[in-house]
């Protein structure tokens, strides 16, 4: 058995003494005095910041929202079932932040940026604060590039630009999510990173959206942030900020991003629940006084950056649900006043089979034609006015027994215009095909057809144009202008298709 000599013991002790590092750590510790309904009240956290992360003894995390004289109100980021009265709470000294990286593309995550798709961990070397200040005035430039949605009604009459905030508003089951997801599908090959944030949705609905993205190949450039209806209110409140932080990461790396918030009504309800449990004074519709700031600080993060910052952009499409078409409720009016326009979806139009059920008359884009290519402006300039006049005339025609020939022709043209705006779900159209479609409708080529024949004729014409006149697409995509040459090619294709179509109908 080996024995240690005195000099060896002396040497070992000296080495240990030299290695000794006297480190004094100060931790901000408190005690739980009350816990329940996703809220904990803590005493003893004297030097905590508003919004600081705290950690409970059993591992649950929370955010300090109420800083009162005698206690601190914490919202829990979990169920908190194992937290006991009297247990210790430690302040972390950090504000809520998430890891960010390119590895998040194609993944489904929760509000804490943890993967929930069962495909393993996500490796990230950088992190971003969940809540960061919006770009200032000097950091921005005006919106001038179009963000094509693939939906004729939007791209022609309510255009959206890169860096814009456009609200999608309507009753439940009117196709709000379908408009948003179709916009994501249309970004394929456009070098746009998409973030879809599902707040308080049914798990089956989110699964359906994710399946559609996989089937259409959209998951390659999309991140899905999902907090279902059974998630704690804190996580539903945080989910949009997590999505915004991920989109900002790409925006500041000179990329174009699109973020969908589906929907902000649910986030406001989660925030109302948290605020009432924290005993904050309720205001209109029992929402807290700062619910406007909740949404304004989120939506102001969408921007088109200037050339010094790389000209990246973040386009936001928030969704808000209305009750029986009441857009004068608190949350709808708040978000309408923050955004750069709104797309109204009508339950009446949806039930009448007009889908997407966009009410073009009261929908508006405050960026307007600045976010359209010149070719679209040339062709679709008067289409919104024509549709508005048609809607007015149609309402009048219900009560008038006899109409003059001009009014009858205007009604017939309006019905065909409305028919060409119909599109099936997950079927976005490239801008060249949209221009051809609108040209046919506004120039009266559909007037000779029955309304039931319009869809079939347009489908066949688009295929015929692509197969026999590929130069048309090349001219529009390269020059962004509806040139005389493009018009001649389109007219030839229309005449050929009209002849073929009349022969088909005769046989």
Curated annotation (Swiss-Prot):
CDD domains documented for this protein: ATP-synt_F1_alpha_C (cd18113), ATP-synt_F1_alpha_N (cd18116), F1-ATPase_alpha_CD (cd01132)
PROSITE patterns: ATPASE_ALPHA_BETA
Major localisation: plastid
Stored InterPro entries: ATP_synth_asu-like_sf, ATP_synth_asu_C, ATP_synth_asu_C_sf, ATP_synth_F1_a_nt-bd_dom, ATP_synth_F1_asu, ATPase_a/bsu_AS, ATPase_F1/V1/A1_a/bsu_N, ATPase_F1/V1/A1_a/bsu_N_sf
Binding site for ATP: 170-177
GO biological process, alphabetically ordered: proton motive force-driven ATP synthesis
Pfam families recorded: ATP-synt_ab, ATP-synt_ab_C, ATP-synt_ab_N
GO molecular function, one term: ATP binding
Topology class, membrane: Peripheral membrane protein
GO CC term (a single one): chloroplast thylakoid membrane
EC number: 7.1.2.2
Catalytic activity: ATP + H2O + 4 H(+)(in) = ADP + phosphate + 5 H(+)(out)
Feature type site, description Required for activity: 363
Annotated localization: Plastid, Chloroplast thylakoid membrane
Keywords carried by this UniProt record: ATP synthesis, ATP-binding, CF(1), Chloroplast, Hydrogen ion transport, Ion transport, Membrane, Nucleotide-binding, Plastid, Thylakoid, Translocase, Transport
Family listed: Belongs to the ATPase alpha/beta chains family.
Quaternary state and interactors: F-type ATPases have 2 components, CF(1) - the catalytic core - and CF(0) - the membrane proton channel. CF(1) has five subunits: alpha(3), beta(3), gamma(1), delta(1), epsilon(1). CF(0) has four main subunits: a, b, b' and c.
Protein name, entry field: ATP synthase subunit alpha, chloroplastic
Upper classification of the organism: Eukaryota, Viridiplantae, Streptophyta, Embryophyta, Tracheophyta
Gene that produces this protein: atpA
């Amino acid at each position: 058995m080996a024995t240690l000599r005195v000099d060896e013991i002396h040497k070992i002790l000296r080495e240990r003494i030299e290695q000794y590092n006297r480190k004094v750590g100060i931790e901000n510790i408190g005690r739980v005095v009350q816990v329940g309904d996703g809220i904990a009240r803590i005493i003893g956290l004297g030097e905590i910041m508003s919004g600081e992360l705290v950690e409970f003894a059993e591992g649950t995390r929370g955010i300090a929202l109420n800083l009162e004289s005698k206690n601190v109100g914490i919202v829990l980021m979990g169920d908190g079932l194992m937290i006991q009265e009297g247990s210790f709470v430690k302040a972390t000294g950090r504000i809520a932040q998430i890891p960010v990286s390119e590895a998040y593309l194609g993944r489904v995550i929760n509000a804490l940026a943890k993967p929930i798709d069962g495909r393993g961990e996500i490796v990230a070397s950088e992190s971003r604060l969940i809540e960061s200040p919006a770009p200032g005035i000097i950091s921005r430039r005006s919106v001038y590039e179009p963000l094509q949605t693939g939906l004729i009604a939007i791209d022609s009459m309510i255009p959206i630009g890169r860096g814009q905030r456009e609200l999608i508003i309507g009753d439940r089951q009117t196709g709000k999510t379908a408009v948003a997801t179709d916009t994501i599908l249309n970004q394929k090959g456009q070098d746009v990173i998409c973030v879809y944030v599902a707040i308080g949705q049914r798990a089956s609905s989110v699964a359906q959206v994710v399946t559609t993205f996989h089937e259409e190949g959209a998951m390659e450039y999309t991140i899905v942030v999902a907090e279902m209806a059974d998630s704690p209110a804190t996580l539903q409140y945080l989910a949009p900020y997590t999505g915004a932080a991920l989109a900002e990461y790409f925006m500041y790396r000179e990329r174009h991003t699109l973020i969908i918030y589906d929907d902000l009504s649910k986030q406001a309800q989660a925030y109302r629940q948290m605020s009432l449990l924290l005993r904050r004074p309720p205001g209109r519709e029992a929402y807290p006084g700062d619910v406007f700031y909740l949404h304004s600080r989120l939506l102001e993060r969408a921007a088109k950056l200037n050339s010094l910052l790389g000209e990246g952009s973040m386009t936001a499409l928030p969704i808000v649900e209305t009750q029986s078409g009441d857009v004068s409720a608190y949350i709808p009016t708040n978000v309408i006043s923050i955004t750069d326009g709104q797309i109204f979806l009508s339950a009446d139009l949806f039930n009448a089979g007009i889908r997407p059920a966009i009410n073009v008359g009261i929908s508006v884009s405050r960026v307007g034609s600045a976010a359209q290519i010149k070719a679209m402006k040339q062709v679709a300039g008067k289409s919104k006015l024509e549709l508005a006049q048609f809607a007015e005339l149609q309402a009048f025609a219900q009560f008038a027994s006899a109409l003059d020939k001009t009014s009858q022709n205007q009604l017939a043209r309006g019905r065909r215009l409305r028919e060409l705006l119909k599109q099936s779900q997950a079927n976005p159209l490239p801008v060249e095909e949209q221009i051809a479609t609108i040209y046919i409708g506004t120039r009266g080529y559909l007037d000779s057809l029955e309304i039931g024949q319009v869809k079939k004729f347009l489908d066949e014409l688009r295929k015929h144009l692509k197969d026999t006149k590929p130069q048309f697409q090349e001219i529009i995509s390269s020059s962004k202008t509806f040139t005389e040459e493009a018009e001649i090619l389109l007219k030839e294709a229309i005449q050929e298709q009209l002849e073929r179509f009349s022969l088909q109908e005769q046989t």
